Amino acid sequence: LPRMPSCLLKLTRVVLSHKLRALFILAFKVMSLASIMLYWRITEDPKGRGQVYSLPVEIHCAHSVPSPHTTAVGPSPSPGDVYFVETSERTNPGYLFMCSVESAARTHPGTRVVVLMKGLANGNASLPHHWGFSLLSCFPNVEVRPLDLLELFSGTPLAKWYLQAQQRWEPYFLPILSDACRIAIMWKFGGIYLDTDFIVLKNLKNLTNVLGTQSKYVLNGAFLSFKPKHKFIELCMKDFVENYNSWIWGHQGPQLLTRVFKKWCSIRSLRSSTSCKGVSALPREAFYPIRWQDWKKYFEAVSSSELHHLFNNTYAVHVWNKKTQGTRLEITSQALLAQLHSHFCPATYDIMKKNS
């Protein structure tokens, strides 16, 4: 009987420690779920939900556009095409999306620019009634097509992954799906891939087997240019499947490309080499002149000398839509983003002014 109090005390301590551990685990799970929900809220386009444009859907092609007789034609993709991909169900492209495609079409007048949209893959013969599609019809080198994921991934290591991924919930599925699409497109067709938050300043056709450097530690696949069936892209597809992790942001995208490039070049640091075995990683200024941490610079005024420097040293500007979306842009201001729209997607820029 005298030992009862000490036993009870030990039992109480054990129970309390288990409760504290359980509370800690519960708090961790709640925080994880909250961060995932916050991510999805951030990545939604606030302007894409029910936005109504005042302009009529029929757009007059007022600006000079590429000549149709110099444009690649044919029913299927061909080597050298420029690709954009929309992996969500959205079929109401916003201003930045439209500027991306328009700037690519203008800088590549003799090249087919293919816009693949998952939301169109439902058997409809006609495009949705939207000003963006009317504007794209002004460019004879632009083709809007449904994104058939089963067909795209067929015959690649990504086919089995895609079927399995559809049967489970993943926090970053859409970005990962986009990562998969770009390497599948590069493997099957080759050509140029661009994210829909790029503004293209120059023709990219002289770049082959090239990707861009985001920072001194990481490469980025928002721009890719490769010949079809390239061994580097094949290794990317294998790494995608063998080292798959859907819970780490960027693991299947920038980090994947960085891993594969280091193995490809047999290096431990990106500073050791920027080109080897026929594959090149261009310096940050070529495609990512403004770091994602400095995204607010797009909304700040720039001098003519700064703009001239950018035009001379950069192929295309990545706007980091995940950060910039929802931020109000004074379209007639001297802000960098407004000037980029004015110079490289004037038709989209005019519509932005009329709707501002």
Predicted regions and their residues:
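Short aromatic/hydrophobic "clamp" motif used to bind/position activated sugar donors
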Residues: 191-193
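Glycosyltransferase-associated regions of secretory-pathway enzymes
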Residues: 2-178, 196-356
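Small-residue hinge/turn detector
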Residues: 179-189
